[in-house]
A protein has these predicted regions:
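Short, conserved beta-strand element in jelly-roll/cupin
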Residues: 40-44
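Membrane engagement elements in two modes
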Residues: 1-38, 50-56, 63-140
Length: 140
């Protein structure tokens, strides 16, 4: 894959909503011999704007090392639809299983303002990359 970002971290801001993501490889839950690579990612969503906003839906685009794409859409995150007042933040951790040692994720959260305005808060691309024994990340 030529379009992998170099870091397992991403940051994006949209209309005062900052989304920061960091991914980690979970070797104890993975089984490379079975093409099973497990990753966790932690997302921090911060309202740096002047108006409250509520996260209503998520849209993830997950691309594995072979270029196969999986889209995930649904209400909220980890069973919640957090409403963030100015200065507030929300953090959660979730996971992803790939059949390749590398991949990427990106997407958006649909946010609603109190006045009914809707916008998509961008989740910038970040890398999912298994680590070899030396701790170096695998890259194609």
């Amino acid at each position: 894959m030529n379009n992998l970002v170099a870091e397992p971290t991403s940051v994006a801001s949209t209309q005062g909503i900052r989304v920061t993501v960091r991914s980690v490889y979970l070797p104890d839950q993975s089984s490379p011999d079975d093409n099973r690579y497990v990753f966790a990612y932690t997302v921090a969503i911060a309202n740096e704007g002047t108006d409250p906003a509520q996260l209503r839906t998520r849209h993830w685009i997950i691309t594995d090392g072979n270029g196969s794409i999986d889209e995930v859409k649904g209400p909220g995150v980890v069973g919640e639809t957090p409403r963030l007042a100015p200065g507030q933040s929300f953090q959660y951790t979730s996971g992803c299983v790939l059949t390749t040692a590398v991949g990427t994720m990106h997407g958006s959260y649909q946010m609603y303002r109190d006045d009914g305005e809707r916008f998509d808060a961008v989740i910038a691309p970040f890398t999912l990359a298994a680590e070899i024994a030396s701790g170096d990340r695998l890259m194609n």
